[in-house]
Amino acid sequence: MPLALWALALSAFAIGTTEFVIVGLIPTIAASLNVSVPSAGLLVSLYALGVAVGAPVLTALTGRVPRKRLLLALMVLFTLGNLVAWMAPNYAALMAARVLTGLAHGVFFSIGSTIATRLVPKEQAASAIALMFTGLTVALVTGVPIGTFIGQHFGWQATFLAVSVLGVVAIVGSAILVPSDIAGDQPSSLLTQLAVLKKPRLLLVYAMTTLGYGGTFIAFTYLAPILQEVAGFEASTVGLVMLVYGVSVAAGNIWGGRLADRHGPVRALQFVFALLVLVLLVLSFTAPSKPLVLLTVLAWGAVAFGNVPGLQVYVVRRAERDAPQAVDVASSLNIAAFNVGIALGAWGGGLIVAHLGLMATPWIGALVVVGALLLTTLAGWLDRRDGVPAKPARIAPQFN
């Protein structure tokens, strides 16, 4: 794989750490800022909303900016946002910092996905996207547990300072490794690019993404409280459990990419979503047992991110058919869909916790993922009806 993909993965590592470390710090932040656990959970939703707004709008507005220059600018914005979080004196300031970093996140992953697919032959597109998103999974393996440890022992502000340092490292890595001659979309007007919202098949993919991730985050947002209050883990060991989850996620992400390359994204997604439904249902019964919940979290990690390569490569392929003038924007809208799902899942999870309790989140999340599975099955049927092949023919990488 090209070195540029590793540069993208390095940036994704920094972004993934700041996105997901908040899950392990929710109880700590709630106690520090004197807010409720559901209120602290809104920090997940606000970040996701920043991504959802920033991804399509800023991607469309920056369509004429050279890709490498844009990547570097985004990482600078990301680093500044984490510095604001480090210095945040109260809950409102921390919320603003989360939105700011979310704006950078959305555009990074939208253009990063299309860059990744253009660096390799087309039949390796899902694996290339998986490699870039490996940065997120490695963040779960190392960044999130370490960040959780730092936050619990040195204050949550110290975690964001550490992530700012990661941002600087990512800027240097991208400046050195990302080439300047990557092919982008042909320049087009903002209205032309946003016309992807009129494409029913793309809207179907966005709905698949929103439900698939929304269902997961109904439960995942409150994993730390479940581990502490239901399973009986000490707060100091939550980071270790997140490490177990992250190791499994790293394997699942690569596995999901290879599955999508081998069998096509739709078939891969059907399999992954079905497994995710099963794991969330099992969690409803295993949470009170420390050994069993550890095994369930391990299985959860293996499928939780296994759908990312398939969803992202599928939206790129659909956009190349339905909106070839706005592939980056179509990709960005799928990043927005991921984060709309995260925001709605975290918000809905808070309502569920407040009214039904923590242990209602896994089985309700499973029901939402069933919706994603049904929509994926519909997408596959429509592809077969239209004669769309499950896997593309070989096409060389695209450079200027």
Language model features: what each stretch is:
Residues 6, 77-84, 92-101, 291-299:
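Paired small-residue
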Residues 97-136:
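Cytoplasmic helix-loop-helix junction between adjacent transmembrane helices
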Residues 55-67, 252-264, 353:
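Helix-to-loop junctions at the C-terminal end of transmembrane segments
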Residues 321-356:
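A late C-terminal transmembrane helix in Major Facilitator Superfamily
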Residues 108-120, 306-322:
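Intracellular juxtamembrane helix-capping segments at the cytosolic ends
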Residues 34, 66, 87-93, 232, ...:
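Helix-breaking motifs and short loop linkers at transmembrane-helix boundaries and internal kinks
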Residues 53-92:
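Conserved MFS/SLC helix-loop-helix module at the cytosolic interface between two early adjacent transmembrane helices
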Residues 164-184, 376-379:
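C-terminal membrane-cytosol helix-exit motif in multi-pass small-molecule transporters
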